[in-house]
C-alpha cells in the first residue's frame, strides 16, 4: 500500500497529475480542492494517497491533507459511491461545504453534483452523519479547521479548454461544462479560478 508520495510535480492536467519520485512517474487523480493547493510544475509536492485495484486498472488518488483522504475513504464506504464519484464530490465542494450539507440534510445541493441522484444524496446524508461526527471529534487544530473550511483560493495557471476538459473528466456533460465555463470566464482568468467558479455556478 502506498500511503504518501513526495516528489517533483512534472504534469498538471486537472484532475490528473504526475509526480516524479526517484525517477518514477506516478500518475494520480486528485480532487480539485487539492489541485488548487498544488505548487507550480518542477516544484516539490507531498500527497497522501489511496490505492485502488480494479480488474481493469490500478488507480492512485492523491490528497494534500490526511483529512481530505480520510473523508474520501468515508465516502467510498457509502453504498453506491465509488472512487470516481467521491472525487467528483470533493471537487464540487470543500470538505466544510460537504459537512454542512450532511448536517443540514441538504439533498438539493448534493443532487446538483454529477452522478449524485436523490437516492445517493439521501444515503450520503444518512450514512455519513455519524461518520463525520467521529471524524470531526478526532480532528484538532488545523485538521478541524480544514474539515470546516467552506472556501478556498486558487493559485494561477492557464484557460477555457483546460477548464472544460477538467469538468468533463469529473463527470459533467461537455455542453454543460462548456456553458458553465463560458458563463464564468473573464479575460485573464486562470484555469483553477475558472474551474472553481464554473463548479460553483452548477451547485
UniProtKB/Swiss-Prot annotation:
Residues 65-143 are annotated as: Domain II. GO terms for cellular component: cytoplasm; Holliday junction helicase complex; Holliday junction resolvase complex. SUPFAM superfamilies: DNA helicase RuvA subunit, C-terminal domain, Nucleic acid-binding proteins, RuvA domain 2-like. One of its GO terms (biological process) is DNA repair. GO terms for molecular function: ATP binding; four-way junction DNA binding; four-way junction helicase activity. The keyword Signal does not apply. This is Holliday junction branch migration complex subunit RuvA. It comes from Shewanella denitrificans (strain OS217 / ATCC BAA-1090 / DSM 15013).
